[in-house]
């Protein structure tokens, strides 16, 4: 009870802080430009997660970028599902042949487009769609305080997903197997706030050909957004992957043993920003 109250107060204070920044800068200020280690990036000043870290610390996700760069070469083709504003895409693009980037949130997509231009990144193609199991129109909520947390309308829309009163819009979604002309990627990164399950349902062909899959794993997303079990989630991981690395635990296991570890993590409400499946 006390823990839940703590988080509600925390979310409330974040929302107030974001609104205060917006008032101080004025409604006409849609982005500020940060010269960061990730690149020259336009960020929403109201964003207190990725945007805040870029503004305050001058970087975001450098450890993850290093891990990804160790898994690709200058000849690699990479698919990023959930590109946000490009803080990972832009540095990764410097070390591979090509990146295809998917971003469903139109506000984030506009910043992504701006940031590619600011960094003169020419080997990234971007698509303002949602990845799903089929072609459909989905309800999508656009968070401001944590714009990277924007997501498909959860089946169980907990307070933690809606504390900043996100606008809910219609977004066109597609099976990536059907939408993308290209289906050969060396590395695929999926981080779409609980919709990973639906995306993987619609990209069986693409997944079957990749060498490395990195996918977010958060128990509350599996439960509230997708409403699926760990077993259902893992059923979509192609069988040619034999190893699972869990960066948050600094552990690598055979996939079958890794599945047991993930179930334990789910039971303990422990997540990981990017599980790594490899051959």
Question: Over which residues does each language-model region extend?
Answer:
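Polar, low-complexity loop segments and adjacent catalytic/binding residues used for recognizing
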Residues: 136-146
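Short internal loop-to-helix segment that lines adenine-nucleotide cofactor pockets
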Residues: 56-79, 121, 125, 137-139, ...
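Active-site flanking residues adjacent to catalytic metal/cofactor-binding acidic residues
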Residues: 81, 102, 190, 215-216
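General small-molecule cofactor/ligand-binding pocket signal
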Residues: 125-127, 245
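Conserved acidic residues
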Residues: 130-133, 175
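S-adenosyl-L-methionine
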Residues: 1-119, 156, 161-165, 179-181, ...
């Amino acid at each position: 009870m006390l823990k839940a109250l703590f988080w509600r107060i925390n979310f409330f204070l974040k929302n107030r802080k974001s609104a205060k920044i917006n008032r101080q800068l004025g409604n006409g200020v849609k982005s500020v430009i940060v010269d960061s280690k990730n690149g020259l990036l336009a960020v929403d000043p109201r964003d207190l997660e990725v945007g805040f870290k870029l503004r305050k610390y001058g970087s975001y996700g450098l450890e993850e970028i290093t891990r990804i760069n160790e898994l690709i070469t200058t000849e690699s083709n990479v698919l990023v599902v959930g590109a946000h504003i490009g803080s990972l895409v832009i540095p990764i693009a410097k070390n591979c042949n090509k990146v295809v980037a998917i971003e469903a949130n139109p506000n984030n997509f506009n910043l992504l487009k701006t940031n590619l231009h600011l960094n003169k990144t020419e080997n990234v193609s971007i698509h303002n769609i949602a990845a799903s199991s089929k072609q459909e129109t989905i309800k999508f909520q656009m968070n401001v305080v944590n714009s990277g947390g924007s997501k498909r309308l959860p089946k169980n829309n907990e307070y933690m997903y809606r504390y900043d009163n996100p606008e809910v819009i219609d977004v066109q979604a597609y099976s990536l197997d059907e939408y993308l002309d290209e289906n050969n990627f060396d590395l695929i990164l999926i981080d779409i706030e609980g919709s990973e399950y639906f995306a993987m349902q619609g990209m069986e062909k693409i997944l079957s050909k990749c060498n490395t899959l990195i996918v977010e794993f958060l128990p509350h997303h599996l439960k509230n957004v997708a409403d699926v079990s760990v077993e259902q989630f893992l059923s979509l991981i192609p069988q040619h992957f034999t190893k699972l690395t869990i960066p948050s635990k600094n552990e690598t296991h055979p996939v079958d043993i890794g599945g047991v570890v993930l179930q334990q993590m789910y039971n303990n409400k422990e997540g990981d920003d990017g599980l790594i499946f490899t051959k």
